[in-house]
Amino acid sequence: MEKKINLSGQELNYDETGNPTGRPVILMHGWGCELSTVRSIARILEPGMHVYNLDLPGHGKSPEPASVWGVYEYADMVQEFAHSLNISDPILVGHSFGGRLAIVLGSRGFSSKMMLVDAAGIKPKRKLSYYIKVYSFKTAKRVLPLLLGHERGQKALDAWRGKAGS
């Protein structure tokens, strides 16, 4: 069931589902997303967990903050949310930007367990071939228009991009 709470003047929309006696789980979506993005995860957890699925400020049905917020302000808000509802040691599930929040909150000792889903702030291990591909294209992007002219250079880049896949 979707609910709203006011935290230090910031309204926060959230969905509370699952087993009220289960371990609390706080779901945090990625940047530019909303709570529906991770609702499929909530459904899996609901039978045994007490799930709080947040619409982070400026996303979904939660209004934007009055000032510019960074990662730490969002993390503070998640902690205030948990404190106001007497949630202790929740399991944090963070997708993308939500994963970055989970990392910050974990570093504060807020939670003893977390699950990161494609989390921002974690650099994936890459093979040398990846870097060769990326930096070759970046170099070609600057050089080909100079060598071939803008139009022919752009066509060559488009053809290369089509073969490379992105």
At which residue positions do the language-model features occur?
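Conserved HGGG/HGGXW glycine-rich cap/lid loop of the alpha/beta-hydrolase fold
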Residues: 10, 15-61
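Structural signature of beta-strand start/N-cap positions in the alpha/beta core
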Residues: 24, 50, 88-91, 112-113
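Conserved catalytic-core motifs of eukaryotic protein kinase domains, centered on the activation segment
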Residues: 37-39, 62-68, 125-128
